[in-house]
């Protein structure tokens, strides 16, 4: 029985899920920790998807200025209530996002927000590079689309690998935060300055 309690404690620390949720996930997975983690992650994503339709009118504007004073970031992160906006988890998330923006230099929040001019310029570069390969046209088209898709994912904040943990994207970190705080959280906008 002690091993079951230890597993519950371990999963609660790792996932920040409630005790009953952890207990149910362990039961469903037959006591398998990896299976329980997977179940909790799926439930967290389902909760995040459900909450994503809720309006967010509260939040924080987080400021970060690099120690040398040459890089600065302002990011607006919204949530549903001022109570959540004051929690340490939410504040840490905002700080992490500001630090990520300072180091990774995204152009926009979501892939669909990538400026058309930048996309057209990148498409032109990719087409020239693909044409130099001497491949058939349909393969060249696929190469261009693949390179553009990769480039867009590197430029949009939500699809970038998270700077502190490259094993997950900023979007996945956002979903984890939604499941931790129990409210919808939205990265609304940001601005990055560099001398």
UniProtKB/Swiss-Prot annotation:
Region Involved in Mg(2+) ion dislocation from EF-Tu, residue ranges: 81-84
Subcellular localization(s) per the UniProt record: Cytoplasm
Gene Ontology MF terms: translation elongation factor activity
A GO-annotated cellular component: cytoplasm
Keyword line: Cytoplasm, Elongation factor, Protein biosynthesis
Gene3D superfamilies: 1.10.286.20, DNA helicase RuvA subunit, C-terminal domain, Elongation factor Ts, dimerisation domain
UniProt xrefs under PROSITE patterns: EF_TS_2
Keyword Lyase in annotation: no
Main location: cytoplasm
Assigned protein family: Belongs to the EF-Ts family.
Biological function: Associates with the EF-Tu.GDP complex and induces the exchange of GDP to GTP. It remains bound to the aminoacyl-tRNA.EF-Tu.GTP complex up to the GTP hydrolysis stage on the ribosome.
Protein name per Swiss-Prot or TrEMBL: Elongation factor Ts
Organism encoding this protein: Rubrobacter xylanophilus (strain DSM 9941 / JCM 11954 / NBRC 16129 / PRD-1)
């Amino acid at each position: 029985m002690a091993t079951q309690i230890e597993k519950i404690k371990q999963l609660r620390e790792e996932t920040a899920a409630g005790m009953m949720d952890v207990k149910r996930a362990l039961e469903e997975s037959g006591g398998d920790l990896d299976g329980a983690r997977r179940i909790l992650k799926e439930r967290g994503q389902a909760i995040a998807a459900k909450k994503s339709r809720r309006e967010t009118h509260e939040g924080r504007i987080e400021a970060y200025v690099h120690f040398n004073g040459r890089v600065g970031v302002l990011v607006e992160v919204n949530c549903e209530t001022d109570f959540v906006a004051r929690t340490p988890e939410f504040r840490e998330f905002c700080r992490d996002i500001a630090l990520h923006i300072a180091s990774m230099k995204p152009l926009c929040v979501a892939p669909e927000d990538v400026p058309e001019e930048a996309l057209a310029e990148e498409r032109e570069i990719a087409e020239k590079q693909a044409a130099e390969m001497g491949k058939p046209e349909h393969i060249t088209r696929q190469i261009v689309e693949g390179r553009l898709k990769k480039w867009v994912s590197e430029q949009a904040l939500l699809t970038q690998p998270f700077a502190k943990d490259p094993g997950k994207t900023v979007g996945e970190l956002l979903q984890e935060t939604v499941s931790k705080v129990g409210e919808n959280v939205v990265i609304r906008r940001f601005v990055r300055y560099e001398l």
